[in-house]
């Protein structure tokens, strides 16, 4: 029932108007982790994120039902409160179908997250287009996010994106510039503007990373490429975000290290 991150967004350039650049953020790297497993009391994923919150700055993507669902799920409510109490930042998941999903439905999901789970103060926008025809669509999402009380939008085209798409007049934006298996990460080349911007403007998620040595390589490359929000996992398949990475403790320490 969950909708998972995709990589087929078109790459036509477009420009946002009235752009602002968020103020530079701290140098420490952070983790952006999709929590696409049901929050049972014994969930290794949820327990691991909770317990690692003292080690690394974590933003967890929350996805109860391909979005917020229509009513409070008591297990999500309890676990979200638990993570919030530990200082984990919480981003609500909405999908946009690369600009084809009705805008009213996206905005409604954003409002529902704030109503059902008020600790969710960040927004994760999946299946983000970078087609010029969708400019007003995403500008409306940014404006609505600010009005609804969100503090930041994480946009996920999952690939290199025209720079104009990575800022907003309404709200700070972080863009996922790489979200794919390990095979493409070593040779990946970020757009030139990435190195000149605050690292907090960018995120990456690398899946199918089978060893701790490759995890360390991925994290170090992300930092070298000026990417602040980092996630690496051994997981793969239709949902590569439903298990705690096998090298979890080492990964959290690696991301948090200067």
Task: Give a label for each model feature.
Residues 11-21:
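Bacterial N-terminal signal peptides
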Residues 26-258:
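Glycan-processing catalytic domains of CAZymes
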Residues 7-8, 21, 111, 192:
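Short, flexible coil/linker segments at or flanking structured domains
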Residues 1-12:
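Bacterial N-terminal signal peptides that target proteins for export
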């Amino acid at each position: 029932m969950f909708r998972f991150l995709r990589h087929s967004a078109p790459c036509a350039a477009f420009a946002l108007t009235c752009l602002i650049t968020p103020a530079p953020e701290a140098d420490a790297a952070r983790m952006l982790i999709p929590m696409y497993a049901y929050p049972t009391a014994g969930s290794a994923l949820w327990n691991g994120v909770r317990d690692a919150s003292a080690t690394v700055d974590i933003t967890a993507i929350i996805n109860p039902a391909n979005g917020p669902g229509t009513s409070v799920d008591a297990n999500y409510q309890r676990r979200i409160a638990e993570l919030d109490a530990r200082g984990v930042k919480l981003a609500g998941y909405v999908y946009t179908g690369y600009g084809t999903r009705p805008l009213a439905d996206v905005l409604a999901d954003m409002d529902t997250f704030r109503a059902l789970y008020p600790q969710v103060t960040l927004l994760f926008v999946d299946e983000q287009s970078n087609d010029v025809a969708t400019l007003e669509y995403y500008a409306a999402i940014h404006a609505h996010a600010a009005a609804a009380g969100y503090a930041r939008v994480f946009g996920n085209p999952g690939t290199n994106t025209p720079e104009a798409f990575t800022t907003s007049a309404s709200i700070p934006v972080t863009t996922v510039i790489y979200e794919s298996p390990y095979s493409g990460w070593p040779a990946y080349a970020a757009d030139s503007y990435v190195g000149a911007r605050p690292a907090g403007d960018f995120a990456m998620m690398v899946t199918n990373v089978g060893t701790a040595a490759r995890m360390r390589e991925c994290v170090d490359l992300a930092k070298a490429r000026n990417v602040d929000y980092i996630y690496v996992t051994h997981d793969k398949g239709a949902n590569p975000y439903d298990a705690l990475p096998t090298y979890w403790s080492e990964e959290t320490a690696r991301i948090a290290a200067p």
